[in-house]
UniProtKB/Swiss-Prot annotation:
UniProt keyword rRNA processing, yes or no: no
HAMAP family noted in UniProt: PSII_PsbN
Gene name as annotated: psbN1
Claim: Lipoprotein is one of the keywords in the record: no
Purpose of the protein: May play a role in photosystem I and II biogenesis.
Protein name in the entry: Protein PsbN 1
Location in or out of the cell: Cellular thylakoid membrane
Main location: membrane
Membrane topology: Single-pass membrane protein
GO cellular component terms attached to this protein's record: plasma membrane-derived thylakoid membrane
Record keywords, A-Z: Membrane, Thylakoid, Transmembrane, Transmembrane helix
Family annotation (InterPro entries): PSII_PsbN (IPR003398)
Organism annotation: Microcystis aeruginosa (strain NIES-843 / IAM M-2473)
Family named by the database record: Belongs to the PsbN family.
Length: 43
């Protein structure tokens, strides 16, 4: 394969991996540890 093809696949895989990690952090089990600033704020 050409170098550009391999580089494109590598970059696409990195972007997909970062997206999956972000979605897992936002909606998966680690989300229970995140605080909600709107609930923490007292009016």
């Amino acid at each position: 394969m050409e170098t550009a093809t391999i580089l494109g696949i590598l970059i696409a895989a990195a972007v997909v991996g970062i997206t999956v990690l972000a979605l897992d952090t936002a909606f998966g089990p680690p989300a229970a540890e995140l605080s909600d600033p709107f609930e923490d704020h007292e009016d």
